[in-house]
Regions:
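Sec-dependent N-terminal signal peptides
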Residues: 4-13
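A generic hydrophobic-helix recognition signal that picks specific residues
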Residues: 8, 191-192
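A generic secondary-structure signal for well-formed alpha-helical elements
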Residues: 12-15, 196
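Acidic, low-complexity Ser/Thr/Gly/Pro-rich repeat segments typical of extracellular/periplasmic
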Residues: 17-175, 179-182, 187-191, 205-209, ...
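Structured interaction patches on ligand/partner-binding surfaces of diverse proteins
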Residues: 116-119, 195-233
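Coil residues (strongly favoring Ser/Thr
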Residues: 133, 233-234
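Conserved small/polar residues in nucleotide/adenosyl-binding loops
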Residues: 236-238
Length: 238
């Protein structure tokens, strides 16, 4: 009797271990989305505070490291803990009391089936009681699939922009539109590049400066900040 029970137990365990989607079944093509953050509203936070970010499905752990960033950049390494469909992010220590920061996940973030998020996800946080609300947006036109907009605080000359890491980064969406949200009311310098990354010298690739030396959000939000990048021709702004 014990031998029969042992055989039955082995069969049950084997069946449990072999559970999988049937051959030819539907393939998961649904991008992961942001579900919630805890705390829900990230105002009046404290340095090094833990923020739990939950997604709609399990993530691929290896994709997180190169897809998460905090803006404006302050050079501090981001600390986080992976928990399946959640990420615990430990906020940076050296924070400005009046600044609104952004945790951003770009489209390099993948679910466990290697499906990327559809567009960048931005999560604002601040030590203040309210977020900055200024915005800069526009389009990048050209014969390419996507591009990246680099934004610096202050009035920088072109040589400095090509040799300095930006404070903020935004990628264009499927409509070639970019948006910077939660900006302070101040002056900015901006540059559009076809490719940007830690191992890419964007100054040697295709890029375009905006026709105005400096942008200012002190009086209003800015839209129609447009660029044109062409692979074969010289680069111009609109």
């Amino acid at each position: 009797m014990s031998r029969i029970l042992l055989i039955i137990a082995i069969i049950i365990l084997n069946n449990c271990a072999s559970v999988r989607n049937p051959e030819g079944g539907p393939v998961d093509e649904i991008p992961p989305t942001l579900v919630s953050t805890n705390p829900q509203t990230l105002t009046s936070i404290t340095p090094k505070q833990k923020v739990t970010i939950r997604f709609s499905e399990y993530l691929k752990e290896s994709s997180i490291k190169n897809s998460i960033q905090v803006y404006p950049m302050n050079g501090e390494k981001i600390k986080y803990e992976f928990k399946g469909d959640k990420i615990d992010v430990m906020l940076p220590e050296n924070l400005n009391n009046e600044m609104t920061y952004i945790i951003m996940f770009d489209t390099g973030l993948l679910d466990e089936h290697s499906i990327p998020i559809k567009h960048d996800i931005s999560i604002p946080f601040t030590m203040s009681s309210e977020f900055d609300t200024s915005k800069i947006e526009g389009h990048v036109y050209g014969d390419f699939d996507n591009s990246t907009i680099l934004l610096w605080r202050g009035n920088l000359d072109r040589a400095t922009m090509l040799d300095t890491n930006p404070d903020y980064i935004a990628n264009t969406n499927d409509d070639n539109k970019f948006t910077f949200n939660y900006l302070p009311e101040e002056k900015f310098s901006v540059l559009a590049v076809q490719q940007y990354g830690s191992n890419i010298d964007y100054a040697k690739g295709q890029y375009a400066f905006y026709h105005e030396t400096t942008l200012s959000t002190k009086d209003k939000n800015l839209d129609k900040i447009n660029f044109f990048i062409h692979k074969a021709l010289s680069l111009i702004h609109i």
